[in-house]
């Protein structure tokens, strides 16, 4: 869940990347307009550093020999027609779910919705894992689960997320400038902000920090991106998987920032060769978002 307060629709009808945009998200909380030349200069340097880091990653990925490292070796030579068919069915399911969410925006989000969403997405992941194992794949090897140490995974994810924020905030700012600063929040954000019991908040925290990052990164980056890259190349794979990721949250004001976030996750996975790096970034992003919602004074200008 790119926690930007997603609508109750797809994989988290909780939702929102990894409170929503408007007044209830980390972007709104941390994206205040600089009030001085010094802060403006710092923001500009931060953005330039972010662009440099991700352009460098893209350049390094492009300079590699295909099928020799990380996600290339794991998916390009392996995923075939059966996986493409399964991915197509998953994408169709996503579109149907998004359509249902958009057509019924007034559905009240609740703990029952959250639990049902968890069970549904968990079943989808289990089906895909079972299918891949039946086909003879080693999922842990494909995802690079043991490629990096725990410390290396955590530090890499934290650094790449740090440099992703200026890109996300820029997309958020541009969206607000073009379409106006909407006040709507994603359902999970409203649910979290309005929850009155520690049990409800703990349930949302567990889902957003531990469950959603694993499920979404497995589906969007490991599987869908892997299949798309196999047939259409890295660029279209990153682009289309990020579009699906943003659309799956069914919250239009958050679409552009979530698209950028999904692209950063895919680049991190492709560069590191480990889906755990993308999962770490996603989990940290959602953790910061919930922290901003719970303690807005920390992130206020």
PLM region descriptions:
Residues 99-118, 130-212, 230, 298-301:
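Juxtamembrane helix-loop-helix connectors linking adjacent transmembrane helices
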Residues 1-141, 147-148, 290-301:
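N-terminal, membrane-interfacial amphipathic/helix-forming hydrophobic leader that caps
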Residues 148-154, 215-240, 270-274:
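Membrane-interface helix/loop boundary segments of multi-pass membrane proteins
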Residues 45, 119-123, 206, 256-264:
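Membrane-embedded alpha-helical segments of multi-pass membrane proteins
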Residues 53-58, 124-134, 209-230:
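Transmembrane alpha-helical segments in integral membrane proteins
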Residues 86-97, 154-170, 174, 210, ...:
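Hydrophobic, lipid-facing residues on alpha-helical transmembrane segments of integral membrane proteins
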Residues 231, 235-301:
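Functionally important transmembrane alpha-helices
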Residues 116, 120, 215-216, 220, ...:
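Residue-level micro-sites within transmembrane alpha helices that shape
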């Amino acid at each position: 869940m790119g926690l930007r307060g997603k609508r109750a629709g797809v994989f988290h009808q909780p939702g929102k990347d990894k409170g929503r945009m408007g007044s209830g998200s980390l972007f709104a909380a941390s994206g205040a307009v600089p009030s001085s030349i010094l802060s403006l200069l710092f923001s500009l340097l931060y953005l330039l550093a972010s662009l440099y880091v991700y352009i460098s990653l893209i350049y390094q990925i492009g300079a590699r020999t295909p099928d020799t490292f990380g996600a290339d070796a794991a998916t390009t030579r392996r995923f075939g027609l059966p996986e493409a068919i399964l991915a197509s069915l998953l994408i169709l399911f996503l579109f149907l779910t998004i359509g249902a969410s958009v057509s019924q925006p007034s559905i009240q989000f609740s703990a029952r919705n959250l639990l049902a969403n968890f069970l549904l997405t968990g079943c989808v992941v289990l089906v895909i894992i079972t299918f891949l194992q039946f086909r003879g794949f080693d999922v842990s090897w494909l995802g690079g689960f043991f490629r990096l140490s725990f410390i290396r995974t955590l530090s890499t994810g934290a650094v790449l997320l740090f440099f992703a924020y200026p890109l996300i905030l820029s997309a958020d700012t541009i969206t607000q400038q073009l379409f106006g600063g909407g006040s709507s929040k994603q359902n999970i954000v409203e649910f979290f902000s309005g929850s009155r019991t520690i049990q409800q908040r703990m349930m949302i925290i567990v889902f957003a920090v531990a469950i959603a990052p694993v499920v979404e990164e497995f589906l969007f980056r490991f599987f869908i991106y892997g299949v798309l890259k196999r047939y259409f190349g890295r660029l279209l794979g990153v682009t289309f998987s990020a579009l699906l990721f943003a659309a799956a949250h069914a919250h239009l004001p958050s679409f552009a920032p979530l698209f950028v976030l999904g692209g950063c996750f895919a680049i991190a996975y492709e560069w590191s060769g480990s889906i755990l790096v993308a999962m770490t970034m996603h989990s940290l992003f959602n953790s910061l978002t919930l922290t901003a919602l719970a303690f807005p004074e920390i992130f206020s200008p």
